[in-house]
Structures are given as structure tokens and as C-alpha cells.
């Protein structure tokens, strides 16, 4: 009887810790390059238009699309080097006449609103997710001006 209570208690405790450990893995490690620097390096390669960047599984996943196809680049957050790439399905087409994504991201970083964990074009605007002090914040920005929507 005691063993059943202990097993249930341990199982409940492990279940409660799961979201915390998953959340902790979604933030670039200390000493990482700023996302704006990562994006600027990808932009300089002229592979296409960057449609999103997300920190996941220890890498920045940067999606780049040209007229023919899209690919995801997996970039080490500390060194900024590309570790691998793969073809992927196209998403929404980015609006024309937008600011470079690295420029918009750099302006957000300069405001000190938190650590950017994701940035993507969605429904004609730029969606940015940040983390600071255990809180998650989402911004919607005009991709042409970088101003909040």
C-alpha cells in the first residue's frame, strides 16, 4: 500500500517537472550569438528570403525560401556555423517590400524585452516570441516598418 502512494507521488512529481525541463531547452545557451547576427550571416549568403527563425533542440532553425523551394538551416547558436540543412515545405509567402529580418530582430534585441526564441511571418505580419524572467511574450510587428501592430 505504501509503495503505491510513493509511486503515485513520484509519478506526479515527474509529470510536473516535464514542462519546466521542456521550457528550459527552448532558450539559447549562455554565450550564444544574438539572433540578429545569425540572421545577418544567412542573409549575406543570398539563399533567398528568410521566413522564420526558431530556437529548437539546441539549434537555430532558419527557414529560407527562394522562387523554387524552401530549406531549413540548422545553426549552432554559439559559433554561428551551419551544422546541416534540409528541404522543407514552403509557408506563407513573405510580403514584398519588407525590412531585412536581421534589422527588425536587432531593434527588438536593443530594447531588452527578452530573449527571442522565435520569429516568423504569419498572416501578413511578423510574429516574435520572447522569454524573460520565466514569462513568455508575443509581439506582432509590421514587417515593412518594424512597428507594433
For each of these PLM feature ranges, what is it?
Residues 11-12, 22:
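Cleavable N-terminal signal peptides
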Amino acid at each position: 500500500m505504501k509503495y503505491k502512494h510513493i509511486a503515485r507521488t513520484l509519478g506526479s512529481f515527474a509529470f510536473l517537472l516535464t514542462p519546466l525541463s521542456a521550457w528550459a531547452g527552448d532558450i539559447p545557451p549562455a554565450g550564444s550569438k544574438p539572433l540578429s547576427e545569425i540572421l545577418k550571416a544567412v542573409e549575406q549568403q543570398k539563399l533567398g528570403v528568410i521566413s522564420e527563425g526558431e530556437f529548437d533542440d539546441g539549434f537555430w532553425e532558419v527557414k529560407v525560401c527562394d522562387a523554387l523551394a524552401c530549406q531549413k538551416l540548422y545553426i549552432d547558436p554559439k559559433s554561428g556555423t551551419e551544422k546541416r540543412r534540409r528541404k522543407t515545405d514552403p509557408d506563407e509567402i513573405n510580403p514584398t517590400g519588407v525590412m531585412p529580418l536581421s534589422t527588425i530582430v536587432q531593434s527588438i534585441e536593443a530594447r531588452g524585452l527578452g530573449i527571442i526564441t522565435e520569429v516568423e511571418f504569419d498572416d501578413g505580419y511578423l510574429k516574435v516570441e520572447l522569454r524573460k524572467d520565466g514569462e513568455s511574450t508575443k509581439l506582432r510587428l509590421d514587417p515593412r516598418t518594424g512597428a507594433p501592430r
